[in-house]
Amino acid sequence: MKIGWAFTGAGHLLKESVEAMEELAKDNDLTVFLSQASEEVLKMYGLYDRVVAVTGGRYNELASDSNQKFSFPITGRLSLGKYDLLIVSPTTANTVAKIVHGISDTLVTNAVAQAGKGRVRTLMVPVDIEPGDVETILPSKLEKTKCQKCDECEAALACPNGAIIAHEEIDLLKCIGCGTCKDICPYDAVSTGKIITMHMREIDIENTQKLQKMEGIEIFDTPQSLLDSLDL
């Protein structure tokens, strides 16, 4: 099958989405669509290289907001029905809101719009799917209560991208999630994979419900449940 997999800038269900994408890439031709935010977030969580690894060659491609500019020419293939399937996982509340209001000004939202025109089946995993609280994983974080404000911050010196502002914070736009800082800090002042609880906003839940009613779009609660629905 010819499949498009689009990532948006959500950290929740991101690792699970990458794992599901890798599974599909084993036996299918895959094009990856990256929003600008997803590029940043994939790097923060140390997952960007895994996404890039499944692309390359004649049939597996990587398209991003940065290399598709403002006209997103690659999405024209979707309007022509040249894909069997478009998957958007994870899908942020911002992306859902744009889609349900007919806005297609990013690579991913434009891909969904063009898929609708080309009658390409579209499967999505919104991160705001039902009311209540949800646990999610944070990228690397400097724990100030543990930081000893060493004269020479070993974590900052070891960071290959200069992402650590000593004693203050981690610049997540520079962070690639390699974990070097956590491994080297003698006071365990850097955390990775910390779990927090987030509350789902009512407006985001309402937009997801609207998304579910849109023609040609199916929604799932996890990437695994999406995979399980496919007869591949």
Regions found by a protein language model. Give the residues of each.
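Cys/His-rich Zn2+-binding cysteine-cluster or related metal-binding knuckle/ribbon modules and their
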Residues: 149
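A cross-family phosphate/adenosyl-ligand binding-site feature
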Residues: 1-141, 146, 160-166, 171-173, ...
